[in-house]
Each structure stands twice: as C-alpha cells, then as structure tokens.
C-alpha cells in the first residue's frame, strides 16, 4: 500500500534586486610593482576629472578621456574598485489588501523570515 505525501507550498514574498548604478571606490593601483613591492596611493574614491577647457579638450574624445581619469590621484578609472549599488523591492501580497484568505500558509509567509 502506498502512502500519500502531501507537499505544502508557502508563498514567500518576492524580492527583486535591480542595479541602480555603479560607484567606484578606493584606488588599487600598485605604484611599487616595478620594484616587486606593494604600495597604493591612498585615494579613497574615484572623482571624475573635469577638462581644463583649453585647446583640444572640448572635443567629445577629450571630454570622454577626462571623465575616465581620477581628479584625486590621476589614475584611470579601471584601477578603482567597482561597487554596484542595488535597490531591493519587496512584493507583499498582504500589503495589497488581499486578506480574505484564512489559510495558515498565507498568513505565516511573512513571519517565517
């Protein structure tokens, strides 16, 4: 005789992560690589350099090159640690006003975590 197996599903609140933007942190350029050592300059955050306004820097290529150079340490943006900033969005069925269900699985879905 076969036994019955009952599987109960809980409705977990859906969580959506969306990438809001990218921030560049501290500089990781090794200035002592040629001597076999390790020395960083201490730049804590990437700050885009503004163009000086002289000569050929007003072209689109000059502005783009200036935006990739750090104003604080002079390094390229690729030497700075890339940090992605995420936004968390929760989808709650209970918050939408759907309280007509009296099943224990739907009422305990928020308190399980």
UniProtKB/Swiss-Prot annotation:
Alphabetized PROSITE patterns for the sequence: ZF_HD_DIMER
Chief site of localization: cytoplasm
Localization (cell): Cytoplasm
Pfam family, one: ZF-HD_dimer
Record's compositionally biased regions (Low complexity): 100-113
GO cellular component terms given for this protein: cytoplasm; nucleus
Family matches, as InterPro entries: ZF_HD_homeobox_Cys/His_dimer (IPR006456)
Residues covered by region (Disordered): 93-113
Biological processes per GO annotation: regulation of DNA-templated transcription
Top-level division of the source organism's lineage: Eukaryota
Keywords: Cytoplasm, Metal-binding, Zinc, Zinc-finger
GO MF: DNA-binding transcription factor activity; transcription cis-regulatory region binding; zinc ion binding
Keyword Chaperone: no
Transmembrane segments: none
Zn-finger region bounds: ZF-HD dimerization-type: 24-83
NCBIfam families: ZF_HD_prot_N
Quaternary state and interactors: Homo- and heterodimers.
Function recorded in the entry: Inhibits zinc finger homeodomain (ZHD) transcription factors, by interacting with them to prevent both their nuclear localization and their DNA-binding properties.
Name by which UniProt lists this protein: Mini zinc finger protein 2
């Amino acid at each position: 005789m076969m036994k019955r197996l009952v599987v109960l599903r809980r409705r977990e609140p859906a969580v959506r992560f969306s990438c809001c933007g990218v921030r560049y942190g501290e500089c990781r350029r090794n200035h002592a690589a040629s001597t076999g050592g390790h020395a960083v300059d201490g730049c804590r955050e990437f700050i885009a350099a503004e163009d000086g306004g002289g000569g050929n820097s007003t072209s689109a290529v000059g502005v783009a090159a200036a935006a990739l150079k750090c104003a604080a340490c002079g390094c390229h943006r690729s030497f700075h640690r890339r940090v992605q900033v995420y936004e968390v969005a929760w989808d709650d069925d209970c918050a939408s006003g759907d309280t007509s269900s009296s099943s224990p699985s739907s009422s305990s879905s928020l308190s399980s975590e």
